Amino acid sequence: FRGLVTFVTEAENSKTVEYMEYMCLYTADGFTGEPTACDEGELAWVKKEDILHLNLWEGDKIFFRLLNEDEPFFSLKLRYVGDTLAEAVLNGKQMELFEERSGDGTPTGTIVERGVAHSEGRCHGTAHIWIARANEKSGCEVLLQKRSAWKDSNPGCYDISSAGHLSAGNTYLEGALREIGEELGFES
């Protein structure tokens, strides 16, 4: 018994719940016999490392990622509006959702969870802000941020003033304004 997954599907343009499913998630590797024909679709053995490369619901990718990472028992709530992932909550905590971007930075309409986006190399938006001010000696100085030791990339390195991922539905400007408020306490 690995986890509980709650699926909620709302109608598009409405908060009406069309479908709700409470799923107990099990894994099994100690079984006997061979699968029989399935009237619900085609059965196929797929290598564990290939699963996330299949055409899956974005929420399914979250719990497959958790299983691959040997996450202990978890509770995952997935809310969809139509076929689009709108919210993901893991163990009572909101997960970060990004809108996938095309090569030119425009939104594709596909919403992905942060861990899935990073593990699959999916293009998503970020906003980077350089803050500078005039000074009398050199003419200009730039506010830099030394990255925390706990950061997953380049801990302890100096970086730009502020940066962060765009939340699903945000524009680049909205993301930039949110980040300088969250990281630096600035208001714009």
Give the positions of each predicted feature.
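Charged phosphate-binding loop/patch that engages nucleotide di/tri-phosphates or the phosphate backbone
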Residues: 69-95
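Acidic pyrophosphate-coordinating catalytic loop
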Residues: 5-21, 118-122, 152-153
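The catalytic Nudix box helix
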Residues: 1-4, 26, 47, 144, ...
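Active-site-adjacent beta-strand/loop module that shapes the phosphate/pyrophosphate-binding cleft
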Residues: 9-34, 105-106, 188
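A glycine-rich, hydrophobic loop/mini-helix early in the fold
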Residues: 126-162
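Short, well-ordered beta-strand micro-motif
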Residues: 25-29, 45, 131-133
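Acidic, metal-coordinating catalytic segment for phosphate/diphosphate chemistry
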Residues: 94-137
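NUDIX/MutT-family hydrolases
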Residues: 27, 36-66, 89-94
